[in-house]
Each structure stands twice: as C-alpha cells, then as structure tokens.
Regions:
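Catalytic machinery of carbohydrate-active enzymes
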Residues: 1-156
Length: 156
C-alpha cells in the first residue's frame, strides 16, 4: 500500500495552531500528491480546512487510545496512521507511549516531534524555531516553511 497521508497532530492552543499553518502549506507544496490531514480539535480542523484547503479529522474520534498502546487503537485510527508517509506531532516525545504506538502501527512512517516552546537561548520567533526543528529531519519541508515564514515577516 502506498503511503500518502501527511498527518499533523496538534492539540495545543489556537495561537500555536496558527503557527503550524506554514507547515501544512509547505507539506502541500513539497508533497502535492499526498493528503495533508490535521488531527486536532474539531473546530480548529474545520478552520484549517476552510482557510488552508487541507483535510482534518477530530482528535476526539479515538486518537487518545494511542496513549494506551497500538493494540487498543480503533480501526479508524489504525487505518489513518498506517497510511501515513510522514507524521508531525506537537506535544509528544520520542520516548513516550503515544510514539511507540504510532511506530508499531506505521513503522515506515517518518515521525517528527515538534514543539512551540522555544529554548531560552533561542531569540527568534516561534515560527522560525519550528523551521529549525524541521531542518534537521526534513530539509525540503523546512525550506518551504522557512520561505513562507520569511514572507509573512516581510509583508507583515
């Protein structure tokens, strides 16, 4: 089965959610053959669908089960995650139960953990920090995100 989903898991606040929008748009540009899907709160997902033209699925539709392990995940969750080529996750860590469950369901998928909490030593905007995090693991996506963020800063 060809993996065509790019999943963006986000359960944070609205401001952090909006900061993630250049990531979604960059994925659409860099991987136009893939489906970019936000897994987030229902209304935030609908907003992203309307403004960005991406897909969304409500995080409350069984995705919390990933915190209990892969075996307990409902079929809809397993199917979506198994079809992922790349998974961006805000608020999870490489060594937590959620990540282990995702890796068990989709071992070939590229799992990338992101945070909107900049280290004290980082003096830039959180959007630029997101670019720095992505650069090490997905340079093409990072370059596209960086171009969009730079354009936003130039235009205001």
């Amino acid at each position: 089965m060809t993996k065509r989903n790019v999943l963006i898991f986000h359960s944070g606040a609205m401001g952090d959610f909006v900061v993630s929008w250049p990531l979604a748009m960059a994925c659409c540009r860099v991987m136009p053959q893939n489906r970019v899907i936000y897994v987030t709160a229902g209304q935030k997902g609908k907003l992203a669908e309307h403004v960005l033209g991406v897909e969304s699925i409500d995080i409350e539709s069984g995705f919390a089960s990933l915190w209990q392990g892969a075996d307990g995940a409902p079929e809809n969750v397993r199917k979506l995650v198994a079809g992922a080529a790349m998974i961006f996750s805000f608020g999870t860590h490489d060594d937590d139960q959620w990540s282990a469950a995702v890796r068990a369901i989709a071992p070939e998928a590229r799992l990338i953990h992101l945070t909107t909490k900049c280290p004290d030593a980082f003096a830039g905007h959180v959007a630029r920090y997101m670019v720095e995090q992505i650069k090490a693991v997905q340079p093409a996506v990072a370059a596209a995100v960086g171009q969009m963020v730079s354009a936003l800063f130039r235009r205001g």
